[in-house]
C-alpha cells in the first residue's frame, strides 16, 4: 500500500485535476482486494452512495491498540479514496487516530474541493467509522 507521505508528494507534482483523478483511481487499483467473506452488512459503511466496506484489526496494547484497516469499494474513484483513508489511519494507535484531521489532509492535497457532495459525504462517513472504531477501543 502506498504511504501517506508518498501520496502527498505525488499530489504535489500533479497540477491538473484530471491527473489527480487518474492517480486516485490508480491508488484504488493498487489496494489489496478484500475477501468476499469480509463484505458483510456489518462491515459496510453507512452513508456512502457507493458500497464501501471497512474491517478493523487491533493488535498490541489493550489500553491503546494498534489499528490496521482493510477497505473495499465497488466504485473506482471511491476505492481510491478508501486507499487514501487507509494510508492516513492504518497502522496507528487508537489514541492517535482520534486526533487526526483527515479532512484537512484531503484539503491539503486538493481533493476535497473536487469531490461531489455525495462522495464528500461518503468520505466523511468512512472517517467517522474509523474514528468511532478507534474511540471504541480506548478505555472510557
Swiss-Prot record:
Stored SUPFAM superfamilies: SufE/NifU (SSF82649)
TM region positions: none
Disulfide bridges in this chain: none
One Pfam entry name: SufE
PANTHER family in the cross-refs: SUFE-LIKE PROTEIN 2, CHLOROPLASTIC, SULFUR ACCEPTOR PROTEIN CSDE
UniProt similarity note: Belongs to the SufE family.
Protein name: Uncharacterized SufE-like protein R01000
Species lineage: Bacteria, Pseudomonadati, Pseudomonadota, Alphaproteobacteria, Hyphomicrobiales
